[in-house]
Structure formats: C-alpha cells, structure tokens
C-alpha cells in the first residue's frame, strides 16, 4: 500500500486531479484510479513500483501497447491511466486522457521505436483480404500450409444459421466467417448444418449450375506435360475432385493463379441469396407501417426486407426515397411530408419519434377531452353584445358576492318587500311558457306576445269567423235590451214621438188610455 501512495506526491498529485477522464467531461482523475491501476498491473505480472518513475511507465507501455488493439476495456483503461501518469512524471501538461495518450504514443515511436521493435509474433497473423497468407492458409518457411478451421468458427456459423434461419443476415455472416477459406473449409461449414436440408439442396443445385457454366466457359486446353498442374474444373472448385494441396497451389501459384476459394464463396453466396428469398417471401412493397407501430420499428423491418432484395443499388436507393414515406401510416406520413424533399433518415427518425406511440395517443386524448370539457367558444359578435354580470344584492356590475360591501338585502329578492320569498312572490313574471290556466302549470308550448308598435304580418281573418262574431254581438245587444226596465222603454218611445211629428197624436193616444175610456176616466 505504501508503494501505491508514493506513486504521485505533492505537486504531481495536484496535477493529476486537474486531468479530465474524457475531453469536455466533468469527471477528473483521483487517487483511486492509481490504486486501481496498481491492482491491474498484478494481472500482467508487472510490479507496482514501475508507476513511480518515468522509465517504469515506459516499460509498462511497451508491454501493453501491442495488446491494446485486441484488448479488453480494462486493458485500454489501464493503458490510458499509465499514459497520464507518464505525462505527469515527464512534466507534460495535458488536459484530458486523449491528449496524454497521443503524447505518450508519439514519444514511444520517436524515442524507443516500439512499433519497429515489436516481435512478429505479437502482430496479427491474418492480413487484409485479397493478400497472400490469408487465414486459414499461412506461410511457414516459404511454403503455404493449410490450417483447419477452429471449432469456434464452425460453432459461430451453425448458431448463425439456427438463430436467423436464412434471414438476410446469413449472407454477410458467411462472408465474414469464410474469409480466406479454401473449398475444403467451405464444405466443412456446409456439412455442419444439420437442419434446413431443403436450403442445402438449393445451394447444391446452384453449385452444380455454376460448375457446369464454368466448364463451358473454360474448356480443357489439351494434354499437359508431365508434372505440370492442371487447370481447375467446376468440380475441382467445388472441392469434390480436388485435394487441399491442389487448391492451395491454384490459389497461390506464381503464374495464372486461380482463386478457387473466392469463386466457390461466390457460388455459395448466390445459393444463400436464393434461400433468403425462399425463406422470406415478404415483398418490400408489402412492408407497411401499422397504425400503432413506432416509426423506428417500421424502418427496421423495411431495411431488413430491402437487404434481402437482390437488385441494383440505384433501385434500392429509389425504394428508400419513395416507399419508405409512401408506406408509412397517416400520422407519420403527415410529419414526413413537412420535412421537404429528400430528407435524411436521421431527420425522419427524429421527426417521427413518439408518433403513433402511447405518449402521442394520450396527448391527443387529453387535448380532445380538454376541448370537450371546456366552454364552447363564443362568436366575436356575441362576445361584444354580451352584458356584464350584475350582482343581485346591490345591483352593481363588476364584482361578485364575496367582493360586495353593501349590506345583505332583506325580504323578497324580486320585489324587495318583506314577508315572503322570491318563490312565493305575487309579482313574479311568467316564464317562456307563460302562466298556466287557473294557477296550474303552463302548457307545453311557449307564450308569444306580439311587441307593441309592430304591424302584424299574418294573413286576414276567416270570413266565417267575422260573421260569427257579428251574430254574437247582435245577440248580446238583444239580451241587454230585455233586461232594461220599463221606464227606459217609455223614454225611448217619447224620444221616438218627438222625432216623428206626423204620428204624434196617434202616439199620444197609445201612451194615454183616452182611446179606450175617453172622457169617462
């Protein structure tokens, strides 16, 4: 523990706490990182005391540098921490880990020549594709030697076929696992597949067709001199009539090499692509987004189906620009059309994030519920004509009952008289149905009152109704005349006598009884 505490002291410990773990990050190095690095050095058989000096850190970096490209995350973190400690010992001011890493690597290459002094055994054994010495064929002592496929590679291939079941991922997976393989190795991979024999038969038929085509395009030149290697036939490329040594010689001979491994891989890829179409019959035109499906899930299904399509890149580009937007649901389509012409996939994913999901549905339902529960909008004209609310107690506008300072009104709220309430007010007005007959409830139709000063525009009355009204008036007059006393009748007759002078005497005789008794009365 003492060695760990003595790695950085004083000013160096203060400088360590100023170095950031990541560029632009907030976290910085602490002493606990030094303790962790010392514990990790024990796993590589390195002493903790090497961290106390600049030369010791250089020795650690020489050991760890070749392992960094293929190392784990802990190894890379240890390498970065040692680079920071080396910069502190070298009194190099750095701001973050990346800057310290670049400075330490530059110093190793310039001064110690670490890259040139690395042993060949620590370098990758598999060179890039297309070059000689590709795995599993390696060069040893000037001769090419075949190395069988590892069980891990075969297991990865079998697991890929079982999990994906000849999906679109099988073709690139086969290309990666069969890099640099001979026809013998490729046949081993195909023989490891136990299930899906129908797909294997499809691949065999494709191989036979391609082999026959190869034989027709490359006829036998004729008899060859003794000891000269013959040219491969279609069956030789398929590995049925050729040995591993012949396949290696065809692939790496100085004159006219024939890459039988790559040719056979191409035939297998054609068969796998046909199997992908058979096992995935869904056409890309049928890939449409569901009404509640997230846009990201729809894009994944679309590109998975597009990957299985065996068409030109130009056609795939057209499908991406047109079908991706055309087959989206109405909600996402409305958003995508607002992005303009030819939007990028990142823009589309960002714009449609959350569209069609539960969050958007809940938001739409909340907005609809808010509109339904809220007050209906008042037209502008009605809002202008609407009167202000008047408080019933004081009769003033602009305040409510809680803000009113006037004393509370006593008695009826309608007429203001004491002794009764508004429900029993005798001066109450009729509603829109009017007052009912004889104190009963009003009828079921509104009472309309014609406003004064207006000329009615109704059609003229019925003549029969007018005649009936006239007869009723005459009968009323006759009834009144019958009820009048006799004196009033006499006065009427006297008035009638004064009007008619020629008959005055006759009328007088009728009024007096002289006509009957004469002068005897």
Swiss-Prot record:
Q: Where is the composition biased (Basic and acidic residues)?
A: 477-511
Q: Which InterPro entries match?
A: Gag_p24_C (IPR045345), Lentvrl_matrix_N (IPR000071), Matrix_HIV/RSV_N (IPR012344), Primate_lentivir_Gag_pol-like (IPR050195), Retrov_capsid_C (IPR008916), Retrov_capsid_N (IPR008919), Retrovr_matrix (IPR010999), Znf_CCHC (IPR001878)
Positions with an attached lipid (N-myristoyl glycine) read 2
Q: Where is this region: Interaction with Gp41?
A: 7-31
**Residue ranges of region Interaction with host CALM1?**
8-43
Transmembrane: is it a keyword of this entry? Answer: no
Q: Where is this region: PPIA/CYPA-binding loop?
A: 219-226
**What residue intervals correspond to the zinc fingers (CCHC-type)?**
389-406, 410-427
> Where on the tree of life does the source sit, at the highest rank?
Viruses
Positions occupied by motif PTAP/PSAP motif:
456-459
Q: Which SUPFAM superfamilies match?
A: Retroviral matrix proteins, Retrovirus capsid dimerization domain-like, Retrovirus capsid protein, N-terminal core domain, Retrovirus zinc finger-like domains
Tell me the keywords, alphabetical order: AIDS, Capsid protein, Host cell membrane, Host cytoplasm, Host endosome, Host membrane, Host nucleus, Host-virus interaction, Lipoprotein, Membrane, Metal-binding, Myristate, Phosphoprotein, Repeat, RNA-binding, Viral budding, Viral budding via the host ESCRT complexes, Viral nucleoprotein, Viral release from host cell, Virion, Zinc, Zinc-finger
Q: Which SMART domains match?
A: ZnF_C2HC
Regarding how it is modified after translation, the entry says: Gag-Pol polyprotein: Specific enzymatic cleavages by the viral protease yield mature proteins.
Q: Where Phosphoserine occurs, residue numbers? A: 150
Q: In which residues does the motif Nuclear export signal occur?
A: 16-22
Q: Segment Interaction with membrane phosphatidylinositol 4,5-bisphosphate and RNA: which positions?
A: 14-33
- Could you say what the effect of mutating residue 184 to A is? Decreased interaction with human NONO
Q: Where is this site: Cleavage?
A: 135-136, 365-366, 382-383, 431-432, 445-446
Note from the entry: This isolate is from a German AIDS patient (with predominantly neurological complications) who was probably infected in Mali.
User: Which family is this protein grouped under?
Assistant: Belongs to the primate lentivirus group gag polyprotein family.
- Description of its domains: Late-budding domains (L domains) are short sequence motifs essential for viral particle budding. They recruit proteins of the host ESCRT machinery (Endosomal Sorting Complex Required for Transport) or ESCRT-associated proteins. p6-gag contains one L domains: a PTAP/PSAP motif, which interacts with the UEV domain of TSG101.
User: What name is this protein filed under?
Assistant: Gag polyprotein
Source organism = Human immunodeficiency virus type 2 subtype A (isolate BEN) (HIV-2)
């Amino acid at each position: 523990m003492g060695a760990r505490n003595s790695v950085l002291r004083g000013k160096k410990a203060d400088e360590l706490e100023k170095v950031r773990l990541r560029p632009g990050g907030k976290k910085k190095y602490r002493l606990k990182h030094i303790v962790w690095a010392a514990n990790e050095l024990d796993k590589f058989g390195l002493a903790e005391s090497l961290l106390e000096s600049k030369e010791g850190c250089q020795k650690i970096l020489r050991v760890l540098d070749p392992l960094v490209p293929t190392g784990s995350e802990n190894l890379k973190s240890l390498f970065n921490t040692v680079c920071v400690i080396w910069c502190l010992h070298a009194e190099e001011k750095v701001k973050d880990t990346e800057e310290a890493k670049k400075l330490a690597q530059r110093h190793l290459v310039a001064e110690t020549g670490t890259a040139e002094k690395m042993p060949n055994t620590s370098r990758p054994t598999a060179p890039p594709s297309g070059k000689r010495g590709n795995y599993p064929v390696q060069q040893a002592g000037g001769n090419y030697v075949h190395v069988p496929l590892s069980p891990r590679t075969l297991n990865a291939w079998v697991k890929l076929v079982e999990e994906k079941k000849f999906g679109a991922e099988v073709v690139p997976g086969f290309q990666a696992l069969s890099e640099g393989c001979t026809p013998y190795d490729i046949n081993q991979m195909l023989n490891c597949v136990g299930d899906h024999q129908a797909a294997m038969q499809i691949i065999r038929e494709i191989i036979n067709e391609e082999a026959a085509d190869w034989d027709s395009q490359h006829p036998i030149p004729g008899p060859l001199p003794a000891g000269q290697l013959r040219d491969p036939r279609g069956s030789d490329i398929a590995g049925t009539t050729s040995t591993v040594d012949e396949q290696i010689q065809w692939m790496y001979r100085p004159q006219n090499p024939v890459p039988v491994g790559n040719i056979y891989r191409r035939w297998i890829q054609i068969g796998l692509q046909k199997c992908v179409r058979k096992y995935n019959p869904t056409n890309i035109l049928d890939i449409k987004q569901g009404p509640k499906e997230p846009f990201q899930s729809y894009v994944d299904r679309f590109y998975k189906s597009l990957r299985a399509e065996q068409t030109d890149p130009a056609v795939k580009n057209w499908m991406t620009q047109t079908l991706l937007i055309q087959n989206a649901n109405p909600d996402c389509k409305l958003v995508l059309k607002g992005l303009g012409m030819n939007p990028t996939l990142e823009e589309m994913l960002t714009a449609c994030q959350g569209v069609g999901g539960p969050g958007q549905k809940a938001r739409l339902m909340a907005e609809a519920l808010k509109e339904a529960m809220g007050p209906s909008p008042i037209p502008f004209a009605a809002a202008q004509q609407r009167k202000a609310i008047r408080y019933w107690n004081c009769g003033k506008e602009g305040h409510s009952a809680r803000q009113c300072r006037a004393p509370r009104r006593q008695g009826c709220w309608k007429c203001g008289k004491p002794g009764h309430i508004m429900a029993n007010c005798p001066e109450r007005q009729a509603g829109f149905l009017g007052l009912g007959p004889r104190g009963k409830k009003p009828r079921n139709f509104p009472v309309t009152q014609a406003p004064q000063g207006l000329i009615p525009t109704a059609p003229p009355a019925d003549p029969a109704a007018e005649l009936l009204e006239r007869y009723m008036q005459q009968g009323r007059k006759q009834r009144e005349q019958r009820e009048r006393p006799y004196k009033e009748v006499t006065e009427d007759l006297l008035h009638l006598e004064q009007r008619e002078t020629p008959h005055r005497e006759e009328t007088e005789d009728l009024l007096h009884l002289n006509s009957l008794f004469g002068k005897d009365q």
